[in-house]
Amino acid sequence: MVKRGLALLLVGLLGGCMQATLAPSSNASLTSRDRQLLAHARYAQATIPETYRRHIVDYTRKEQPGTILVDTNSKYLYYVLPGGKAIRYGVTVGEEALAWSGIATVGKTAEWPDWIPTAEIQARLGPYPKRVAGGPDNPLGARALYLYEGNKDTLYRIHGTNQPEYI
């Protein structure tokens, strides 16, 4: 279980606590598997508005470096860095996740995770196979952080997407 002090704090209002964007972060390093899976992804050319791209921003709240905050109203995720900075990412928060708030730890991480749609998701958005293998057609995207309360999986994830146009 990964516990490197990462905590998730869902916050309703973070307005006014962030300064101007300093500069876009450099592109993430892609593994050879990432490059192979993304080579022909239908969303490879999706345009994400500049404001929702990854940026390093000033951060003046009290959370410690390593903390992850999700601002559901502004649709941003902040990864707190040392020195009053944070990496800000544009996000979409699913309807189910809006029902939960609190503090959790990252209990597990996965690259190209499989997705097992719940019965509720099947009824609302399906039909899907019982299991969708990791890859460019999987709604969880390339990475997932599994959120735990104590030793219990909350079933909530911070994950990528195969639909960046909805960010």
Model-inferred region functions:
Residues 12, 23-24, 97, 167:
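Residue-level recognition of conserved structural "scaffold" positions that shape functional pockets
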Residues 8, 23-24, 110:
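Structured catalytic/translocation cores of nucleotide/phosphate-coupled proteins
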Residues 15-38:
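Bacterial Sec signal peptide processing site at the extreme N-terminus
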Residues 41-164:
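Gly/Pro-biased beta-strand-loop elements
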Residues 8-10, 162-167:
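C-terminal/domain-terminus segments
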Residues 5-16:
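Bacterial N-terminal signal peptides
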